[in-house]
């Protein structure tokens, strides 16, 4: 079973990807990890990618797709895989289809922007320990201070509301064509079309996990 998981920053995609990978015993495939591994192993594709990166250029879709096809040949992908952060663009999705890389399921974790902004902008971190709090959902005993050390908590730059809004705007601009592409393809009910599901991304981590696994295992 090959799965693409879509979700905005803060939608819980990383957490759910871990659960899905473990429950279905399939690897979670990240293009970043693949790229680093191929460069380190000095595979032909890895050497080509290194040459591009050393020149300060972006790795092309052709190289990324070659990495994906190379990775899918590994034994641990025999029962499928979960794509993490791929495809990112409509061009990559179309290239997958053109090259005959089948996808069984596309799952979108749907969370309103307002909810994501609340989730992310409310995070506070104790930098030296990594302990994380939330001003609404998991507040420290004393406002602004770490429970164990009493040291100040900080808001990471990535969690500032303006930054979150910009990240969401980029996500929607980039992902809307992907959602339209896969949902449209799925609705055609033709052979080899993936199943597309939009899953409510609010509730407990376990509830969301069960919703996703429910649609993946009911077919």
UniProtKB/Swiss-Prot annotation:
Annotated spans, NMP: 30-59
An example Gene Ontology biological process: AMP salvage
Pfam families, alphabetized: ADK, ADK_lid
Pathway(s) annotated for this protein in UniProt: Purine metabolism; AMP biosynthesis via salvage pathway; AMP from ADP: step 1/1
InterPro entries from the UniProt entry: Adenyl_kin_sub, Adenylat/UMP-CMP_kin, Adenylat_kinase_CS, Adenylate_kinase_lid-dom, P-loop_NTPase
UniProt entry tagged with the keyword Kinase: yes
Region (LID): 122-159
GO-annotated molecular function: adenylate kinase activity; ATP binding
Reactions performed catalytically: AMP + ATP = 2 ADP
Alphabetic keyword roster: ATP-binding, Cytoplasm, Kinase, Nucleotide biosynthesis, Nucleotide-binding, Transferase
Assigned EC number: 2.7.4.3
Enzyme class: transferase
SUPFAM superfamilies: P-loop containing nucleoside triphosphate hydrolases (SSF52540)
PANTHER family for the chain: NUCLEOTIDE KINASE
Protein name: Adenylate kinase
